[in-house]
């Protein structure tokens, strides 16, 4: 992500999440060498993005969002593939995330990409309160 996409990512955060990241938090990620935000642009706007933080050989997906009007076009899957390739290139051995237990479309995508459910975080989300499924994928070496 570059400075030019901050506004679009902020808008997408507000569209997709009940507790969106602030513009300040997103700007701080620009200066974080361990953070990588990969944006997809369509029709002149940020159509989707994925955020990843890498720490000691592990990649953690912090955010995945695709604008409702651009869903079902492969944008999320392409960003996920790009995030995985980058994590492997930088030496990560696994990638992990949390997803709402009720988010069946997202869970299906992650399973298609080789993620496995490895645990649950009770009441992880609010508005509405919901458990998170923890999903992890180990990279072949």
Can you say where each PLM-predicted feature lies in the sequence?
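Short, solvent-exposed loop/turn elements at beta->coil junctions and helix N-caps
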Residues: 26-28, 121-124
């Amino acid at each position: 992500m570059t400075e030019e996409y901050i506004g679009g990512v902020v808008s997408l955060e507000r569209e997709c999440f009940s507790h969106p990241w602030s513009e300040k938090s997103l700007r701080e990620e620009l200066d974080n060498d361990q953070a990588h935000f990969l944006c997809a642009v369509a029709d002149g706007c940020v159509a989707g993005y994925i955020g990843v933080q890498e720490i000691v050989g592990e990649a953690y997906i912090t955010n995945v969002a695709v604008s409702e009007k651009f869903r079902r076009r492969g944008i999320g899957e392409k960003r996920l593939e790009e995030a995985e390739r980058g994590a492997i290139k930088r030496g990560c051995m696994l990638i992990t995330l949390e997803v709402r237990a009720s988010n069946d479309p997202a869970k299906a995508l992650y399973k298609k990409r080789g993620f496995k459910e490895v645990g649950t975080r009770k009441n992880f989300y609010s508005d509405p309160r919901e458990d998170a499924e923890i999903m992890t994928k180990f990279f072949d070496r």
